[in-house]
């Protein structure tokens, strides 16, 4: 199941990253050309923002690819919070090593009930249970041995050998 917001954000991200027009041949034989288009970026990004009662972006903002990329990353983080998409987003953007190799900060979940104020103090969580790591090899999944055995031309992904 794809949410409408995910479809819109995927489209905005794709057209923001296009460097040159791309033509697709459709099953009925017609062709559709997609290109970097700031008007579409504004239109579809703002559909998400406006339905939440938030201000949209302007054509001037949409003209800056890097700014739009950062806005998309931020919007996806909020729109899909607790939906399990963040890990794959970070991998796709190449941001996972930076994000997962730093300590987690947040509420002090170890504060006792009589230390209510300590709960709201931002704390670095750096114990065995909260420590995370991400290395280059995690950008790729290992190819199962059964698949490698069936096709001798396949080579295991880097660092999974």
Model-derived segments and spans:
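A generic structural signal for short coil/turn motifs at secondary-structure boundaries
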Residues: 23, 56-58
């Amino acid at each position: 199941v794809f949410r409408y917001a995910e479809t819109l954000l995927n489209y905005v991200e794709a057209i923001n990253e296009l460097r040159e027009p791309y033509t697709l041949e459709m099953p009925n034989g017609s062709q559709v050309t997609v290109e970097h288009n700031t008007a579409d970026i504004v239109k579809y990004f703002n559909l998400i923002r406006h339905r939440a009662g938030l201000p949209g972006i302007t054509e001037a903002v949409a003209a800056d690819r890097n700014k739009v990329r950062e806005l998309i990353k931020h919007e996806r983080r909020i729109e899909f919070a607790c939906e399990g998409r963040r890990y794959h987003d970070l991998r796709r953007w190449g941001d996972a090593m930076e994000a997962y190799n730093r300590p987690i900060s947040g509420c002090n979940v170890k504060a006792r009930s009589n230390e209510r104020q300590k709960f709201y103090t931002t704390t670095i969580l750096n114990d065995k249970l909260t420590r995370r790591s991400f290395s280059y090899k995690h950008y790729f999944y290992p190819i199962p041995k059964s698949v490698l055995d069936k096709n001798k031309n396949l080579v295991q992904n880097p660092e999974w050998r």
